[in-house]
Amino acid sequence: MKVRLSPLLFCLVLLLGLVSGCGGAAVREDGKISVVATVFPLWDWTRELLGGGAEDKLSLTLLLDNGTDLHSYQPTVDDLVKITSADLVIYVGGESDRWLEEALAENVNPDLIAVNLMDVLSDRLKTEEIIEGMRGREEEDDAYDEHIWLSLKNAEVCCAAITDALARLSPALSEALAENRTAYFARLEAVDSLYRKAVDGGARNTILFADRFPFRYLLDDYGLSYYAAFAGCEAETGASFETVAFLAEKIDELDLPAVLTTDSPVPRLAETVAANTRSSDAAVLVLDSMQSVTRADIEGGASYLGMMESNLEVLKEALR
């Protein structure tokens, strides 16, 4: 979904850029460097890299903290203020961040650092694919899959780029950042090894989603195959009878123990597909794409690695 700035917000960006450009982005009341990350995984990576000793030097803000999906997000005036007054902006890139790139293009602050992680991952990007049984998108172009964070291997590459940007902003933190990066890489690699072990020990190598499919990066990392109702960025998720029938038949054909869904509070499509299998006993499981994380979730202890570990347990069940 392409999100663009409205004419009114576009004019506001110009005004905010002129104001922030006059004073310099680093000059603010609390004297802290301002870092903004658009979505939860990016925010949590940055939090881990900063560790616990940087609160007096940097403030870290999560832009989408109310559960709004990246693809349906509409920026507010407050969001634009945060972006244009930041010292560092970390974002995914892609069509859903078109509005942000428009805002950055009009920002006259020469010191602002912007890290586009799809640029960082340019040689690892994948296009959204339309496979058998999946309803195609209305757009004709081969859009890149924006769900880059669902690969632990991508996470390492992104964290390296974020570390470099933070060190540029605050050279005094360089040593601590390097230590935190090394420690976090070890944790990422440990979970990656658990995924590999689970996939190698699984009874099958195909899973099925009765939902949008944002997990291509994750499944490709471990050589897994899939069927799904819709592509990852598909806005409309009303399935046809043909889609339901195809997915139900695939569950029967491959003897799959589960049908998966993503973050949906009411997984009606998954339940319908499961009910239309021969045995009607396929479990409905949720694999979390981390697109709807709220401030309350974070206060409750949500973390990127914790959610990847929870997803691993779901994947084990789907591959048994």
Residue ranges of each PLM-predicted region?
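Bacterial N-terminal signal peptides
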Residues: 9-18
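Extracytoplasmic metal-acquisition and chelation regions
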Residues: 17, 22-320
